[in-house]
Amino acid sequence: MSTPTVRRRRLGVKLRALRDARGLTLEEVAEKSNGGITVAKLSRLETARSAAKAPDVELLLDLYGVDDRELRTALLALTREGARRGWWQSYRGVLSPAYEDLISLEAEATSVRTWQIGVIPGLLQTGEYARELMTSIGMSEAVEDKVDALVEVRLARQSVLTRESPLNLWAIIAEGALRTRCVGAGVMRDQLGRLLERGRRPNVTIQVLPSDSPPHVGQMGSYSVLGFEDYADLDVVHVESLTAALYVEDGGQVGVYRDAFERLRAAALSVEASAERIEQIREEHGPR
């Protein structure tokens, strides 16, 4: 991506809206600032390509005649938070830029709707499942050296589900992902138990799409829609491949993924029937 934080994007959207409300062009704002801000800098701020600094934002708010104390305070808070370091940055030598982007987005999202065709969603994985999954897929030696750290990160990501104002997770999982033998039977049994446990949380919804379902849009691959309350136009779709991650930000394309998720939701088992199916498959994996 490498994506600017959602806070930066929100700030850019607000600054653009304030400028538009005053009927000013980029050039007119630059002229009014008497050299305080250039056209290029303002463009970068509005498109979140550059991190904003408080003096620049205060100057713009003055130029736009923003006297509302609460609004000024909120926008300056976004300015400060946009440059805030996340816990994952201490793993910078371990994580790819695309993975850092995903963690940053999850940390700021209010909802995640995820469809997984082959594995358990990362936000619901146990440490043992994550470790065996990573080592069973033929990692390079360079990555194998980082497995411990990657498992730590995988588990740390899950704090978004238990934080104050927790993220709302809706996961639809293909039944085949629950039956896969890519990890040991005991590990899989514990993993399915974790799904049942997490599914009892009020902010977590888990559905299973049966293996005998007719052809469906989800067969095109797994993806997640990260949502941001009050900023639906900033929703992002994350699509992971073997070598890279794709982030879809165009509103029309994001809408296609949202609609596809709704079709998958309608085709999947109910929450109650999904829990029963998970328990049934868990028993099939045998004792620990």
Language-model region placement:
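Short alpha-helical DNA-recognition segment
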Residues: 23-43
